[in-house]
Each structure stands twice: as C-alpha cells, then as structure tokens.
Amino acid sequence: MTPEVLRQWQELAEQVREHQFRYYVRDAPVITDAEFDELLRRLEALEEQYPELRTPDSPTQLVGGAGFATEFEPVEHLERMLSLDNAFNTEELTAWAGRIHADVGDSAAYLCELKIDGVALSLVYEGGRLTRASTRGDGRTGEDVTLNARTIEDVPERLSHSEDHRMPEVLEVRGEVFFRVADFQALNASLVEEGKAPFANPRNSAAGSLRQKDPAVTARRRLRMICHGLGHTEGFRPATLHQAYLALQAWGLPVSQHTTLVADLAGVQERIDYWGEHRHEVDHEIDGVVVKVDDVALQRRLGSTSRAPRWAIAYKYPPEEAQTKLLDIRVNVGRTGRVTPFAFMTPVKVAGSTVAQATLHNASEVKRKGVLIGDTVVIRKAGDVIPEVLGPVVDLRDGSEREFVMPTTCPECGTPLAPEKEGDADIRCPNTRSCPGQLRERVFHVSSRNALDIEMLGYEAGAALLSARVIGDEGDLFGLTEEELLRTDLFRTKAGDLSANGRRLLANLDKAKAAPLWRVLVALSIRHVGPTAARALATEFGSIDAIVSATTEQLAAVEGVGPTIASAVSEWFTVDWHREIVEKWRAAGVRMADERDDSVPRTLAGVTVVVTGSLPGFSRDEAKEAIVTRGGKAAGSVSKKTSYVVAGDAPGSKYDKAVELGVPILDEDGFRKLLEQGPPAEVGEPT
C-alpha cells in the first residue's frame, strides 16, 4: 500500500464522518443521499482492495451515528441496533441472495417492506408499559428521547391485551419515525410563514422534531411511526418475522400494511418493480424496499457484521434528483404581502413530472444555499412535494454566474419593501389593500381547496376579473352578476352570450355562500389561520360576530389557536377594509355562522373531552364531531380543565396524564352513554 492510497483513504473517511455528523447529529446534510452513498461505496471499494485499511473504527464498520456527542442522555440498547447494507441494482441484490442461498439453501422466504425515509427509533416495553425510547446512535448507545416519543400518537403508552398473543415481559421493538408528505408540507409552510428556515426534506424534519429539547414542540408536529423489527425480548420468541408483526399489531403497535411475504428472489424483484412504479401512492416518502429473511432461526444462523445483519438488505431506488440550469431568480408577492424569491429554470423531468420553477423561500435561503443566477443546480422532487433547489454544482461554474439581489421595492406596485418587524427573514409589501399581486393571490386563495373550494375561479379567472375591473377586491366576488361577467372576454362567447363556464362560476359562487364557517375564515386570508385553527375557532365561537367580539386572551385559550394566531385574528378585524370585505360577503348571502342541529341534544355543553387510542365504533373525526355537535369541546391534550378522557385500544400518554390528574376515564360504552345522557354522576376507569 502506497502513501497515496493511505492519503486517499484518510480523505474519504474524513468526508464520510463529516457528512455523517451533519446527517445524524445536526439534521442538516449538505449533500444528497445519493452523493453520500457514492462516497461510502468508494471507501468500501478501497478497503476491499486494501483490507488492512478496514480498521474497527472505519466508517464502513460503524453504525452511522457512532462517536458523536449529543445533548441527550445516553442510553444503552438491550440488543445492538444495527444499520442495513444497500443494494443499488439487480446485480448487487442477486449477489446478496446468492450468499444467502450458499449458506442456508433454498429454504429462505423473504419479507419485502417499504424503506421509509425517516429516523430510526427503539421502544422498550416492560410489563406492557413503555419505559424507554431511544435513537439508534452508534448501535449500542443511543439518545434517550422518551418524553418526545410519548407525544407521537402512534406510540402506545401501554400495550393492548391480546387473546392470541401473550404479552412479553420485555419487548424491545424497532421502527421508523417519519412525516407524511402532507404534514411535512404543512410544517414547512408554517415555518416559512413565521420567517423561519424550512426543513430540507421529511427525513430531516422528523429527526429534528424527535430531538427537540421541549416535548411540547414535538407534540405539535404530526410525527408518525411504523415498527419494523425486534431487539431484545423476554417471553416472546416468534418463529418468523411476519408472525412477530402480527403480534405487534395485536398489541396496538403500528406496523406497515404494505409488507409482503414472498417465496424467492423473483417475488422480491416483483415487489421492487411494483413499488418503483407506485411509490408516490403512499402518503409518506420511501426510498427503496427492505428485503429480510423471514425465518428467525435462519436469521440467527446468518448473523451480522459489526454494522448490519447479513440476513437483510435495503434495495435503494435511484434518487429523485436532477440537474438543470438556473436561468433567473424572480420574486413573487403573496396574498399576505410576503415577497418570495423563486428559481426559474430550464425545464427538466424529475420524479415523473416536468419542473421549471421552485421556491427559494427568502433571501436568507438563497444565500444559505449558495446559488448564483446561471448556476447548474441540483433540484429534488418526490411525489407531490414542492420542487426544491438543493444547491449549486460549483465545479460547473464558468465565471458568468451572478449573485441574486433582493429588490427593495415591490415588483407589482412599487411600494418600498421592508420586514414587518426587526429580525424577520421575510420582507413584505405593506400595500396590502391595493397591491395587484396581493389582490390576485387573495382572490385565487378564496377559491382554493382548503378555503371555499370554488370551481371555475382559478388564477386566470381571478386575474381576468381584476384586470377588467369587474371586481375591486375579493369582497366583490359574491355580488357578481351575469352582466358583469359579460365584460370579460374569458366568460363571453363569440356571440356575446355568457359562456357555460361563466354560468358554472355563478352557480358555484352561490353554492359557496352556504359553506361552513371555518372555510369562510380560511378564505379571508387572515395570516396563520389555516383549516386547523379555523375549525377550532368555528367550533368554539360559532359565528364571525362572536369571534370579532372575543378578546385576544379568549381566542388564545382555544385549543389549537394560541397567542400568535389569536393576535393575528384580533389585528385583522381591526382593519377597516377587512371588515368591509366581511360585510360585503354577508350582504351577498355568505353564511357567517354555523347552523346548529337542534335535533341533536346539547348533552355536552361546557364539557371538555379528550379521546385517546382507537375506538372500534368511531373514527377519530367521528368521535370529535360527536362531541362538538352536542356542544362539547374536543380537546387534543389533557389538563386540569379536561372533563373526561375516553380511552380506546392502545391509549397513549394522555391516559397516564388523566390518571395523574384524576380526570375521569371512560371506555367506549361509557362514551356512548355520555353522548346520549350527558355527564354521569360518577365515572371510573374502564374495565
């Protein structure tokens, strides 16, 4: 081995460890997964050629997070928590299966599981109760994140009883914590709205959310978990992995519904091909298929290396990234005045669709990513996730690139731009009432799916109505007449009559007048008020007038609202032209209060109920609706103000909180009686 080879190994090993630190500890990687995999494979190839380089402390021999100090208390796993080896093509998968065959013959059946792009978590249950949750760490010692894990709805505080599966004395179960795509998008949107940097991808957001110092922050983020393996167990020795999954499910632990048992490598390849085509039909991101030998005895025979089991492998799909030219960086003015830079690029196909634009969030993000106009950039798009510019390909720069300069005046109306308050990352156009860009976005927002969901009132239609001065702002929408629509080319036929689309628009506007109050609140473009907060306000107050009359403190006290949203709502209604929009809509017949169904008895007036666990007779939304329609409040957390907790199968930490505070606990039968008869005289724990 020459000094040059040793130098090359040292450089590669140092790069791998640096990127592992950024990935596992800082949750802020600066290269893509594919680029990291390539670095690791180069290091492995070098060690294959020169085995003396394969020392115990080489990154190829360690689990990803090994050796890094963290801010959480260290905790030892009962059994080592290993990583997985990867296969990137059919040849590597076949070679792995060949090694299995050489060792155990044709007797191995395989489990095929979706490889969720999340963060690994280990749960320990003793006597059926959750006693510890920890991250992977170096495989032997992880970080104690028990308090945060208890806030994840999928993680039961106690295992459920099962007639078919005896509950083990000790159960160490491994799984993946992740964000659903829709929840990830909602989280990033809220971060950007608050002037904070968004997460790069769902995996980073899951890791960052799980490792919050304040469990309340984790609780507000809709993390999910799926269990996919076992560690140490006492009183539980399943013969196969798929039998183990059936037991986990019976005990109330979340397992994937997409796992398939196949007989041979041909079946494995069929699953890999299938999910390669259908990966975006799942509500969370996947980056491959994990293949495992199902027979536990064969697993023990095959054993493991220092970092990964020999009986499992992760087949990884090609990255959903592409390179293209950044032609320009332009800015867009949003409905609340926020000025957002976006990338204008040479169209490129990625993740099954053609991408030509991507948001850059704010000037700070442009600087952080280090992109210049004229750069070749790497973009990423997975399924329905909004396209994202990851960064520049610096080696391809030729000197013609130039920096982006954020404008100082609004590109739509010329008003000087400024942050709303000192320290904000976002800059805004303060001309909120008449800025053409804000007007177009607000009119379009009224028709959006989360607001009043008005078909035929798309971006083009809204712009046409404004440019023809048929409407002055969104307040005029519900007063539109056939004569006014005829003033726009878009809704007029060649014969001068109202087009079919024009008639549909008028009909849809009329239909939208009867929308529930929460949709009206969303449609008003009150900052921070999305469907969740709007539903909470509508449920608590019932009418626009009651919301206007409420103090900021009363608004903030509503579950799911809080002080930031409460202040935004109060401030919005103090603006004269905002109230004019409300009155225009009211005069046009838009419903400003929710109708109460008098046929449903108000048995829960003044009662606050928290539901935890699964109820066979109710979905989560059905249970909440049953409470609200009877005048009660369906809360999301337990406090001294909680009247009752309804505990279904696999209740979470809310059950323990109720016991601690002495809050009455009902089972499903007790819940039904509560709905029918109102509060009973005495309520005990479910039997």
UniProtKB/Swiss-Prot annotation:
Q: Which UniProt keywords apply?
A: DNA damage, DNA repair, DNA replication, Ligase, Magnesium, Manganese, Metal-binding, NAD, Zinc
Residue sites binding NAD(+) per the record: D33, A34, E35, F36, D37, S83, L84, E113, R136, E176, K292, K316
Catalyses which reaction? NAD(+) + (deoxyribonucleotide)n-3'-hydroxyl + 5'-phospho-(deoxyribonucleotide)m = (deoxyribonucleotide)n+m + AMP + beta-nicotinamide D-nucleotide
Cofactor(s) recorded for this entry are: Mg(2+); Mn(2+)
Q: Name one GO biological process term.
A: DNA repair
Q: Where is the active site?
A: K115 (n6-amp-lysine intermediate)
Keyword DNA repair: yes or no? yes
> What is the top EC class of this enzyme, as a single word?
ligase
* Protein family according to the UniProt entry: Belongs to the NAD-dependent DNA ligase family. LigA subfamily.
Purpose: DNA ligase that catalyzes the formation of phosphodiester linkages between 5'-phosphoryl and 3'-hydroxyl groups in double-stranded DNA using NAD as a coenzyme and as the energy source for the reaction. It is essential for DNA replication and repair of damaged DNA.
- Name this protein carries in UniProt: DNA ligase
Species per Swiss-Prot/TrEMBL record = Mycobacterium marinum (strain ATCC BAA-535 / M)
Which taxonomic lineage does the organism of this UniProt entry have? Bacteria, Bacillati, Actinomycetota, Actinomycetes, Mycobacteriales
| Gene name of this polypeptide | ligA
